[in-house]
Swiss-Prot record:
GO terms for molecular function: structural constituent of cuticle. It holds the Pfam family Col_cuticle_N. Residues 78-269, 281-316 are annotated as: Disordered. This is Cuticle collagen 7.
Amino acid sequence: MSSATFLSVMAGLSGIVVFGALISVFHIYSDINSFVEDSHRELGEFKGFANDAWNSMINQDDSVRMARSVFGRRRQKKQSQCNCGQQASNCPAGPPGPPGASGDKGHDGQPGQAGKPGQPGVAGPSHHQKQECIKCPQGLPGPAGVPGQPGPKGPNGNPGAPAQGGGQGPPGPPGPAGSAGSPGQAGAPGNPGSPGKSGQRGRGLPGPSGAPGPQGPPGAPGQPGSGNAPGPAGPPGPAGPNGQPGHPGQDGQPGAPGNDGTPGSDAAYCPCPTRSSVLRHRNVNRHRAAASKKRVVAKKRVAKKRVVAARRHVQA
């Protein structure tokens, strides 16, 4: 088999493989699009189920909240009859409660009353008569206007007749100086000059001093000192470091017991708030946790379906 035949066969096989790869890519792309559309549809259905469940929980929570608020009011009325101590006054307001659920849509209003009839229209002209302009007599002439701008320059006139017998005129003034000429050739070298007179020998100023020489060798030791008396005392040395801290001292004697204090005044505590706000917070948090748990379960189901679909596609 020749090389040309082998190359042509390999090129044909390569083209078939590339064509098959393109077809498989197109199928995979279409499968991915269908999977994404199915996922969006399932997510929309799940969102609808979640909204319905949330609305049902909100409505149920509203009924429970109303019943608890009624019971709380009765309990508060019963507790208000207790005369346990001095009632508090000027107590600060508690924290604001959570926003309530949105109310139902109101009913449509009744149609308004009919308007009053309008005023009768005004009739327009039936026909139009053509009128001629009034002819006025001619008036007096107006004042003279401002002088106009000078006109443009006229053309040159014709040349005059030639002069007759005037003679030669006087000479004109001298003309300007001409430009410099080109440089001339170099001249011949001159003769050598006569020798000059001998000069007087000068004497310059002394130069600066040189650098100091190297240090010489040490000298011989000196003679021993006279007398056996000690020399004078030297200057005092620097202060030494601080010493170690000493041992702690013994404890003192206990003091005498103090006198009894006077009884304090009434604290005037504020009354406890109703339990409706606390229970409302707990119910809302519990419902939110349940809804978030349902969302997580639904997301896990969708992810599991995606994995199963991908495995089926790979096996196919």
